[in-house]
Regions:
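Short, Lys/Arg-enriched, disordered terminal segments
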Residues: 1-3, 301-302
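Non-catalytic surface loops within mature trypsin-like serine protease
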Residues: 27, 104, 123, 231-233, ...
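Residue-level "edge-of-site" marker
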Residues: 129, 254, 288
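ABC transporter nucleotide-binding domain
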Residues: 169-262
Length: 302
């Protein structure tokens, strides 16, 4: 396994920032690491990268124990922290040259040119980092993480500060890197995780609450289907709440409703019966699986 953590615990006095979590990430996997603010995501990432020592438990990167061999594990990792520390007085190419020296990168000019092209920094490469927008500063951090061609990428909020077009570009970079490397990344933009990852790990209050393929999580939640219905006429919300098998009703807009259920076929059948009995016109009726956002809310609002 490229990343493995076992019974990881990090305490600050009586507070358990990370509480006995275990998971593995294999080569070629892109795994989304999710949790609300303060859940322990960044703490876990800092332990895996060797920037923070755990209270108990163990972490390995490419089979190397992080606590016992922090320098060797850092050579295997490309790390983009949430707070991307950069030298603002250095030029982009100058900074990447410094990072190349730190990692003793062979053929540094070629590698620097390659990551600049890959991360879309070419037009900004002759500027000082302090002159760049937040989005381009984020790209510099990602370029630095990729420069020494690491086996493992750990990215904490990699699309923070990017505009929609830039997000799509960086998403493609991450997906491409994930074909050959191990990628663990956190994001508050759940749509990004859905677009990039097949598997997600969710932690809440320092504890692991989910670790599975996204498709399995969508199937496994007890109320994992949504029926979307739009009427031509106004319908009382209470009528829909009384439908057998409906666990929740949310009014989306005028005459449109979202119904939570684990039996969408039964609910749709009853909606058609109600429409027939009350002489109502249904404009649209469709089923969708539970989104990552709703799964996340259900698992972290406990």
């Amino acid at each position: 396994m490229s990343i493995e953590v076992k019974n990881l615990l990090k305490e600050y006095g009586e507070q358990k920032a990370v509480n006995n979590i275990s998971f593995k990430v294999a080569k070629g996997e892109i795994v989304g690491f999710l949790g609300p603010n303060g859940a322990g995501k960044s703490t876990t990432m800092k332990i895996i990268t060797g920037y923070l020592h755990q209270t108990a438990g163990e972490a390995w990167v490419c089979g190397i124990n992080v606590a016992e061999n922090p320098l060797e594990t850092k050579k295997k990792i490309g790390y983009l922290p949430e707070l991307n520390a950069l030298y603002y007085d250095m030029y982009v190419r100058e900074y990447l040259g410094f990072i190349a020296d730190v990692h003793q990168v062979e053929q540094p000019k070629e590698k620097i040119g390659s990551v600049i092209e890959l991360t879309g920094l070419k037009s900004e490469s002759k500027k000082k980092i302090g002159q760049l927008s937040k989005g381009y500063k984020q790209r510099v951090g990602l370029a630095a993480a990729l420069l020494h061609d690491p086996e493992v990428l750990i990215l904490d909020e990699p699309t923070s500060g990017l505009d929609p077009n830039q997000i799509v570009e960086i998403r493609e970079v991450i997906k491409k890197q994930g074909q050959e490397k191990t990628v663990l990344f956190s994001s508050h933009i759940l749509q990004e995780v859905e677009a990039i990852c097949d598997r997600v790990i969710i932690i809440n209050k320092g504890e692991l609450v989910a670790d599975d393929k996204l498709s399995n999580l969508q199937k496994g939640q007890k109320d994992n289907h949504v029926v979307l219905v739009q009427f031509r006429e106004t319908v009382a919300k209470g009528v829909l709440e009384n439908i057998k098998g409906v666990s929740g009703v949310e009014e989306q807009q005028t005459k449109s409703y979202k119904l939570q259920t684990k039996d969408p076929d039964l609910v749709k059948k009853q909606l058609l019966e109600i429409a027939l009995q009350q002489n109502l016109d249904i404009v649209s009726l469709q089923t969708e699986s539970q989104s990552l956002e709703s799964i996340f809310k259900e698992l972290t609002n406990k």
